[in-house]
């Protein structure tokens, strides 16, 4: 894991097209902004895990025709 230190208003780059900017810090919360192409999904981890578990619970259609 790469660990970086950024101040409010500073940005980091992921590849050529994704930026992550620190928008604010209040107590133990950090507000960040993510700029990414529309074809790149960006989710909070808990939402991503929910999406993955819902995908896993979907059973494929049976082959009966």
From Swiss-Prot:
Any single GO CC term annotated in Swiss-Prot or TrEMBL for this entry: cytosol
Pfam family, one: CsrA
Keywords per UniProt: Activator, Cytoplasm, Repressor, RNA-binding, Translation regulation
Domain of life: Bacteria
KW Ribosomal protein (keyword) present: no
Gene3D superfamilies the UniProt entry points to: Translational regulator CsrA
SUPFAM superfamilies the UniProt entry points to: CsrA-like
Cell location: Cytoplasm
One GO MF term attached to the UniProt entry: mRNA 5'-UTR binding
GO process terms (BP): mRNA catabolic process; negative regulation of translational initiation; positive regulation of translational initiation; regulation of carbohydrate metabolic process
Main location per the UniProt record: cytoplasm
PANTHER family found in the cross-reference section: CARBON STORAGE REGULATOR
Family designation: Belongs to the CsrA/RsmA family.
Subunit organization: Homodimer; the beta-strands of each monomer intercalate to form a hydrophobic core, while the alpha-helices form wings that extend away from the core.
Purpose of the protein: A key translational regulator that binds mRNA to regulate translation initiation and/or mRNA stability. Mediates global changes in gene expression, shifting from rapid growth to stress survival by linking envelope stress, the stringent response and the catabolite repression systems. Usually binds in the 5'-UTR; binding at or near the Shine-Dalgarno sequence prevents ribosome-binding, repressing translation, binding elsewhere in the 5'-UTR can activate translation and/or stabilize the mRNA. Its function is antagonized by small RNA(s).
Official protein name in the record: Translational regulator CsrA
Organism: Marinobacter nauticus (strain ATCC 700491 / DSM 11845 / VT8)
Gene this chain is encoded by: csrA
């Amino acid at each position: 894991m790469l660990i970086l230190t950024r101040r409010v208003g500073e940005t980091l780059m992921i590849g050529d097209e994704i930026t992550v900017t620190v928008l604010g810090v209040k107590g133990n919360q950090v507000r960040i902004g993510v700029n990414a192409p529309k074809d790149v999904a960006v989710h909070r981890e808990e939402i991503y895990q929910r999406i993955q578990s819902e995908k896993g619970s979907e059973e494929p259609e049976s082959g009966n025709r």
